[in-house]
Regions:
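Metallo-beta-lactamase
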Residues: 160, 169-220, 265
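Active-site neighborhood of phospho(di)ester-bond hydrolases with catalytic His/Asp-centered motifs
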Residues: 113-115, 137-147, 165-168, 239-245, ...
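Divalent-metal (often Zn2+) His-rich catalytic cores of metallo-beta-lactamase-fold enzymes
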Residues: 156, 259-318
């Protein structure tokens, strides 16, 4: 076996162990016909490979990088963040570094909905929030759910002193992420350790002052995410969400979950403000959801026709 340590945006120092098996002679050399790579995070299998054939001493050409490339330092990601006004006190932060975040301006502080993708992108988002509304501190980050693409900047947010607003079911998990060892590949939090500050939401949290009101709700009736949150800005009829809908998806397996959440909370949504995608009027959201769901139905039918199964099939929804 071989063991090594690599960096992970969410998990910090991740130890991998590759185990080799099924050795067979190939041109006089005993070589493994399969190997399995497991990480030290819950013994998660990262890669399992079975070899079809080997080629020994084959011509692979010159694989060396040019001298100038070998001598150059590793590039620093150059991120550009755009702040688009959605409504007074609400901006969509988007750009070339990853998923969106949403900036919310209160009377004496700023909040972000989502710290996504990775640490560097989240640092750029926080910097953009501060420059968009100078003089007000960014004090909290509302996180839609625990998936890695939505929490890639969690450790950066903690290092910046932000309070993490999350559904109560995520608290232990986020505390675990904050405690992960990050020594081989240090980040902002390992260089400047701080305790995680969490504000847990059970079902509903109202954030309100003289400038802005935001209702944070637990997501119901959704089998994509556990312990999810969405936010509603009643004054401007905005729904802020991560993974309840994405205009870029081709299929949608979750039936009426979007409208179920809106109806359950008695919201009057006029525009959707997504973490993935672009701001859309609710009529376009409904039209796209219907198209995506019908595409999912067709996919399920194809899968069933060859006697296979797929998670999410058959669909249950009301047209």
């Amino acid at each position: 076996w071989v063991r090594w340590v690599g960096p992970h945006e969410n998990l910090g120092d991740l130890t991998y162990r590759a185990e080799f098996s099924g050795y067979e002679p190939v041109d006089g050399v005993w070589l493994p016909m399969s190997f399995n790579v497991v990480s030290d995070f819950r013994d998660n299998v990262q890669l399992r490979l079975h070899v079809d054939r080997y080629v020994l001493d084959g011509d692979v050409g010159d694989l060396a990088a040019p001298p100038a490339v070998r001598a150059a330092p590793a590039p620093t990601p150059a991120y550009t963040v755009d702040a688009s006004v959605v409504a007074p006190g609400v901006w969509l932060l988007s750009g070339n570094g990853g998923a969106n975040s949403v900036l919310l301006e209160f009377a004496d502080h700023l909040s972000l909905f989502e710290v996504p993708t990775n640490r560097a992108w989240t640092a750029a988002l926080i910097a953009k929030a501060r420059s968009t509304v100078p003089g007000k501190p960014v004090t909290e980050a509302i996180i839609s759910h625990h998936h890695f693409d939505h929490t890639g900047g969690l450790r950066t947010a903690i290092a910046e002193g932000l309070t993490i607003v999350t559904q109560a079911g995520n608290v232990a998990w986020f505390e675990d992420l904050a405690r992960r060892k990050v020594e081989a590949f240090p980040d902002a939090l390992s260089r400047n350790p701080k305790p995680i500050k969490i504000r847990a939401v059970d079902d509903h949290l109202k954030l309100s002052d003289s400038k802005l009101t935001v209702d944070v709700y637990r997501v119901v009736s959704n089998n994509h995410m556990a312990h999810g949150l969405m936010a509603y800005v009643p004054e401007h009829h905005l729904l802020i969400q991560g993974d309840l809908f994405d205009v870029g998806w081709e299929v949608y397996f979750w039936g009426n979950t979007y409208d179920d959440n809106v109806a359950y909370r008695k919201l009057e949504v006029e525009r959707d403000v997504p973490i993935h995608g672009r701001v859309l009027p609710i009529a376009e959201v409904h039209a796209k959801l219907k198209e995506q769901t019908r595409n999912a139905e067709q996919l399920c039918a194809k899968v069933e026709s060859v006697n296979l199964s797929m998670p999410g099939c058959p669909l249950a929804w009301n047209d």
